[in-house]
């Protein structure tokens, strides 16, 4: 709210956000553009197009923007979609490489444009270690490209047996 000209470019892969939800949370929908994305390649292409258009503007005329990807963990690859359509049961071993390449390019463009980006992702438990740890899905590309990594977890806050809210725990990893 401190900058009424600022906006958010929201890449949405879960089909979980609607315009009404945005309005219900008190967010001006005129300041938010939602792009539905299905694959890593589609996200990469759309994000690069947005950043290229932004960089074409005179720096003094640029309105502040922020990019958001919700959720990286839900993005498929074109190979995975093609394999599924063909009835193949093979795992897509190219996903981590495609993600790493996408964020290698995006990180440079985001830095040049001075545009922050927030990415949500899933975590999983690393099996086989003496002290179990959480790891982000999708390979190491995002881990190395990120300026900050914050793990969020939640548990229900109860009053007796009635759930009255959530307790959110934040752990800064990087």
Segments and roles (model prediction):
Residues 3-101:
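Conserved inter-motif catalytic segment of the P-loop NTP-binding fold
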Residues 92-174:
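Phosphate-binding/switch region of NTP-binding enzymes
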